[in-house]
Amino acid sequence: MKKHGVLNSEIAAVLASLGHTDTVVIADCGLPIPDGVKRIDLAVEIGKPSFLEVLQVVADDMAIEKVTLAEEVIINNAEVNKEIEQKLIEPAFEYVSHEQFKEHTKKAKAIIRTGEATPYANVILHAGVIF
């Protein structure tokens, strides 16, 4: 049995398979998930698990080079935006329109769906390298 890092076998497998610049999305419960993209659904009820809880666990286990967010989060969910900026201080940040964000999700290796039910609580994590 694994005792450190991500315990969810689907998430652990996705993270282990990532190459440089591959992407993983952590999403609220309302983000549309495109056909053909792996869905890892963690939502058990509204708010559980939270977006920030899942982000923290994944970020602790992943080399992240860049973060993409919908620009709408800045005004419509400033608290989540602030928390993301505080948790992920090393990667570069990119803000795009929500429509562009949804287009980018079509290229993700996986989308991890949380129980989060606040606006624009979604992030695209771009894999970096560990060397």
UniProtKB/Swiss-Prot annotation:
Enzyme class, spelled out: isomerase
Keywords: Carbohydrate metabolism, Cytoplasm, Isomerase
Disulfide bond sites: none
Subcellular location: Cytoplasm
EC number: 5.4.99.62
One cellular component term from this protein's GO annotations in UniProt: cytosol
InterPro entries according to UniProt: D-ribose_pyranase, RbsD-like_sf, RbsD_FucU
Highest taxon listed in the record's lineage: Bacteria
Sites where the protein binds substrate: 28, 98, 120-122
Active-site residues, record numbering mapped to chain: 20 (proton donor)
MF (Gene Ontology): D-ribose pyranase activity; intramolecular lyase activity; monosaccharide binding
One of the GO biological process terms: D-ribose catabolic process
Pathway: Carbohydrate metabolism; D-ribose degradation; D-ribose 5-phosphate from beta-D-ribopyranose: step 1/2
Reaction(s) this enzyme catalyzes, per UniProt: beta-D-ribopyranose = beta-D-ribofuranose
Record text on subunit structure and interactions: Homodecamer.
Similarity-based family: Belongs to the RbsD / FucU family. RbsD subfamily.
Role: Catalyzes the interconversion of beta-pyran and beta-furan forms of D-ribose.
The protein's name: D-ribose pyranase
Organism: Bacillus cereus (strain G9842)
